[in-house]
């Protein structure tokens, strides 16, 4: 069975209640299903808190965080350090054997600089599946942060949705993007069950899909096209629905290729 990549984002990393719900659902799922799981995470809220504490400005361009050279070490520490190890601690608490990684480990995801104006922000491309497949075969849960490294040895901050997409392509995995919201909402706040590229374009033009959600939708569309299968955007808030979601039941917005 294809591995399943669960991309975590939003304020989930900031909420003990949410993490408890998520890891309880993961334990339940792993007990009754053989499907290998991989977690990919960002940690924007962890970074924002740290930047605020250090009085450093947070700038975004087209929904992507601008990462100057003097901030990449701080962001790496927040994502590959604090956020990653927090998730490993929760896995340990729930007796899940997990391994913390970043995109460069085992060359799992190749990263190049996306745009000089964004600074240390990386473009993620599929890499080698060997390391993660080896971990999955031995029963481990890989927990992968969205920090990458270029062939020149430059650390890069990668949008976590795009990192998860590249890793899904690497592993031939299915992908779920877990978010704060129950999916993509229309202008009246109602969840849209299915989304095509044409529909997304229309909603972006109408200003209904904005900011970070544009990046999320484009990443999901890119993933659906790359993987040749649908990708789900759903909420982590309803823990009781997560095992069914992990099993392929649509619970949020299903992005069609």
Swiss-Prot record:
Assembly mode: Homodimer.
Domain of life, source organism: Bacteria
Molecular function GO labels: acetylglutamate kinase activity; ATP binding
Function text: Catalyzes the ATP-dependent phosphorylation of N-acetyl-L-glutamate.
Entry protein name: Acetylglutamate kinase
UniProt signal peptide: none
EC number(s) from the headed UniProt entry: 2.7.2.8
Species: Escherichia coli O139:H28 (strain E24377A / ETEC)
One GO cellular component, as annotated: cytoplasm
BP-aspect Gene Ontology terms: arginine biosynthetic process via ornithine; L-arginine biosynthetic process
